[in-house]
Amino acid sequence: MIHFLLPRIQPNIYKNIDYIEENEKKDPVISNSLFFYLFDIKNKIDIYEKEWNIYKKYTNPYEFIHTNIPMKKRCVCKYKPLSRSYFKMIELINFFQINMNSTLPIKTFHLAEGPGGFIEAVVKLRNRKDDSYIGMTLIDNENNSNIPGWKKSEIFLNENKNVILENGMDGTGNILSLDNFVYVNEMYGSSMDFITADGGFDFSLDFDNQEYNMTKLLYGQVVYALCMQKMGGSFILKVFDCFMQQTIDILAILSSFYEDVYITKPQTSRYANSEKYVVCKGFKQTTNHNFYPFLYNSFSKMVSNENPTKFVSNFLNIPLSYFFISKLEEYNAIFGQQQIEYIHTTITLIENKYKDFKIENLVKINIQKCIQWCIKYQIPYNNNITINTNTFLSSSSTPNFSFIGDSFGRHNDITPHSTGVVAPP
């Protein structure tokens, strides 16, 4: 797993936290050439929108952990979690040695969590009925398919009574609510051992503005986490691109509050997308009393300013060091190159008229990678999967993929000792 350790920032930078808007949307401030190259190649995806959603699963090395193998009715992993985010959390916790072995009960909070894959992973790893796991996500009252609520989680919630759903003061589960922010701070301030934030949108129709569109939700998740985090605790946050000043500011803020902050992309995250994770370990503050007013002020300004002619530009009112910026450019170069290569490979596969043999080889290789991943993280897997020659559809057809990793099932294949906890590499 590729990962970068960010430079530490002075701990009193919280005094410079602010919400700053400008009249125009700002251009990228780092890695400009990479930004525009990604912009161009992502636009090529639009040409093959239908085919892309199929063939991206062939070029993703770890797709078949949770996705049905072509011409088969099963995937590599026997375990069927609430969502494929379960596998990402298993991988992140193990690789970064997030402590899940405490003999004392722990408290965890999971922001933008529906349908519950991150909580499910922690519940499995801990296997403690005296822990408290709290999930908060936007409540969907209109059956919006783009809002991953708790609909699939009924069986899981019934089996795990120590998983609590928090809907906030207004009952909406909306993180971008000032009332909910104040309420969560009063209820859970400085008390959480482990926090996750997995917020996102359906970006399929707007790849190019992912980073900007995520800004407010990203910052909202961060201020919630900082207010709730217990001293010594850990936080895992999903991010996307990092070209804009506001994203850089958020990473700098996190680097000032934690001993170690990493940026990484799990193997179970599709290589052709912009998704990455920030892993923060060792929270430095004993309470939030000193920094809460600064977070409240900036968050209040952000959620109350709905002027469509104004654009968020900064969350810090001071410049950052050249060293910090250069490290982010280094990480952009590595992750960006990997993403470009996988997008290019997928588009080339789509355009290839004689793709059957190539697809067959990809599937065979990727199945073995998925099996090795399951072995590494002690996840039960189907070890009698075979792919016969000439089992694929003609190149003029499109394979039929169906997901089973996004539906909840009973976990009879898991033994008490198959927890998914292994020593990191």
Q: Language-model segments: what does each one mean?
A:
Residues 1-187, 311-415:
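Intrinsically disordered, low-complexity glycine/charged-rich regulatory or linker segments
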Residues 107-112, 132-135, 196, 234-238, ...:
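Beta-strand cores of modular interaction/reader domains in eukaryotic scaffold and signaling proteins
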Residues 113-118, 138-141, 200-202, 241-242, ...:
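Conserved beta-strand elements of beta-rich interaction domains across eukaryotes
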Residues 208-263:
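Conserved Class I SAM-dependent methyltransferase catalytic core
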Residues 249-305:
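Class I S-adenosyl-L-methionine
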